[in-house]
Design a protein with these regions (language model features):
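N-terminal amphipathic/basic leader segments beginning at the initiator methionine
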Residues: 1-40
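Glycine-rich phosphate/pyrophosphate-binding loop regions near the starts of catalytic domains
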Residues: 23, 31-158
Length: 158
């Protein structure tokens, strides 16, 4: 009997990093999360405090401080005159203004649904940038989570 030598090569492929949609991996805290934040959030909303990439922000104030939180869950996420990103920024700024405060800083958290088109996420980010620049506020911290398809409504913002 003749023996045949089998040549098997095992290769570990590089992970896929370019996606057309949000995947569960984008919320895992790993490579995909960091890529989404670096190319998306940090790149679009860049400022010195956000660029520190901490889970919080350290701010110095000499007088009273007003703060608020609000969550935005709207369908559709794009509507005549804006999108959920602009609504979230302007709504939070309005809440602070109703306290008599002059808004300077905001936090920003996303709950993204698996399958959200990356193009839609970018459009929401650009709406956030536009609204925050118009109001003169900086996004200084935030969080991003991804939920299974069918467990959210594209994007929730706090």
């Amino acid at each position: 009997m003749s023996q045949q030598k089998l040549s098997i090569q095992l290769n570990c492929p590089l992970p896929k990093l370019d996606f057309d949609v949000i995947t569960l991996g984008h919320g895992s805290g790993g490579v995909l999360t960091h890529r989404l934040l670096d190319t998306g959030v940090f790149n679009v909303l860049k400022n010195d405090l956000l660029n520190e990439q901490h889970d919080g922000a350290i701010l110095n104030f000499s007088g009273p401080v007003a703060f608020t939180t609000d969550s935005y869950v709207v369908t559709p996420i794009f509507f005549p005159g804006g999108n959920i990103g602009e609504l979230a920024v302007n709504g939070s700024i309005n809440d602070l203004a109703m306290c008599g405060a002059i808004p300077e800083y905001l936090s920003l958290s996303f709950i993204l649904e698996e399958g959200l088109r990356m193009e839609e996420f970018w459009e929401v980010l650009l709406g956030i940038k536009k609204a925050s620049e118009e109001a003169g506020v900086s996004i200084v911290t935030g969080d991003t989570k991804v939920v299974d398809k069918g467990k959210g409504d594209k994007v929730f913002i706090n």
